[in-house]
């Protein structure tokens, strides 16, 4: 496995994706299922494939992804981040193009915690004058 496989770990919200890629025909497997089956929405599939489209490697690699935690959007973002890191592991010259597109940087936005005395993170109880 070492040598022919390149790997990368991606994170987004509360999702973590471990990505393994090797030379192949372009088959992407997420948690044992085809990417079309795993991500129901076309936008999630598009987000996950963005680094491959940018670097013209859509049908160059077979990719295996193990992803857990979070929802569909977070998992798609984590997969994108992981694929980006795996591509950089494969070829370091791709880093500048991927970095310019903003795929290398981890999106640090997380859900803000709920505070005591409020309905949610920022929503206060309804104010009544009388």
From Swiss-Prot:
GO terms for cellular component: cytosolic small ribosomal subunit. The keyword Ribonucleoprotein applies. SUPFAM superfamilies: Ribosomal protein S5 domain 2-like. GO terms for biological process: translation. One of its GO terms (molecular function) is structural constituent of ribosome. The keyword Transmembrane does not apply. It comes from the Bacteria. Belongs to the universal ribosomal protein uS9 family. This is Small ribosomal subunit protein uS9.
